Regions:
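A polyanion-binding, active-site-adjacent surface
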Residues: 2-177
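Internal, well-ordered interaction modules that form the hydrophobic cores of assembly/scaffold domains
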Residues: 174-193
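Structural motif
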Residues: 61, 181-183, 225
């Protein structure tokens, strides 16, 4: 556990005490991936690695990187950069903070449908932050904010090694808390885990939509990978798909998952 938490603390200290070096580091990562304009990582926001109560969350969502909202992000930043203790408390209780401030997010609205279907809970949409606080932890592959993001389909050696190191650090951290389901969201995960053979075996789910799902296990933990961002409506994914079709495919594959989520 100490490795990732130490990495997060060192990153926070760099951001707090040496802004110039922090900006150079973040810019170098943007340069590594050839990112331009709004896709470049923001150098004036502290990194966000783990969001939610990771010790207890049964569902872990692995994303690409934290996004950016003109309304929400400056408020988040003001809270996170007050102190190291405040940073930890803020991201641990992130969903409660969003609930208290009545924040809205298209991503989390789409995620409410998916988690409602997976957990079989009856949290209404207006109480989605309570659902996330009880069930969800987000872990970012790249911890820096950006307005958009587009990574190469084929990774060079430097890009692959950076992403592999971050993936291993995240997995080694979260596996000790024994979550019940891991979800990998986005094309980069197919590029990294499947195309680069970081997982030994996987099964492609039957699916008529314009994206693919892959099932596998990591240390016995049920895992699912979406090769596109599941929250994007233009891919032909509907809210009914998120609440019913996709959860059914996952539960059909991992028959004990419903029971495991109920036991939390």
């Amino acid at each position: 556990m100490a490795d990732l938490l130490q990495e997060i603390r060192e990153e926070y200290q760099l951001y707090t005490y040496d802004q110039l070096q922090y900006k150079k580091k973040v810019n170098s990562i943007s340069d590594m991936f050839g990112l331009k304009q709004k896709n470049r990582f923001k150098t004036d926001y502290c990194a966000a690695y783990v969001i939610g109560r990771f010790q207890f969350a049964p569902i872990v969502m692995f994303g690409l990187n934290p996004g950016y909202s003109m309304r929400n992000s400056p408020i988040e930043e003001n809270e996170a950069n007050k102190s190291w203790q405040n940073y930890q408390n803020f991201y641990l209780n992130f969903f409660r903070y969003f609930s208290h401030n009545k924040f809205e997010s298209p991503y989390y609205t789409a995620l409410w449908y998916l988690l409602s279907g997976l957990t079989g809970t009856n949290f209404p949409k207006k109480r989605k932050w309570e659902l996330f606080d009880q069930y969800l932890c987000n872990i970012e592959l790249i911890p820096y904010h950006s307005e958009g993001i587009m990574l190469p389909d084929i990774l060079n050696k430097e890009q692959f090694e950076y992403l592999q190191e971050r993936y291993i650090s995240n997995i080694n951290f979260i596996r000790q808390f024994k979550p019940k389901l891991l979800i990998f969201n986005g094309k980069v995960w197919k590029t990294l885990l499947i195309n680069r053979d970081l997982i030994e075996q996987h099964i492609e789910a039957p699916n008529a939509k314009q994206f693919r799902m892959y099932f596998f296990e990591l240390d016995g933990i049920p895992s699912v990978l979406f090769d596109r961002f599941f929250q994007r409506h233009f891919l032909g994914i509907t809210n009914d798909d998120r609440m019913f079709t996709i959860p059914k495919l996952i539960h059909d594959r991992f028959e004990n998952l419903s029971h495991d989520l109920e036991k939390r």
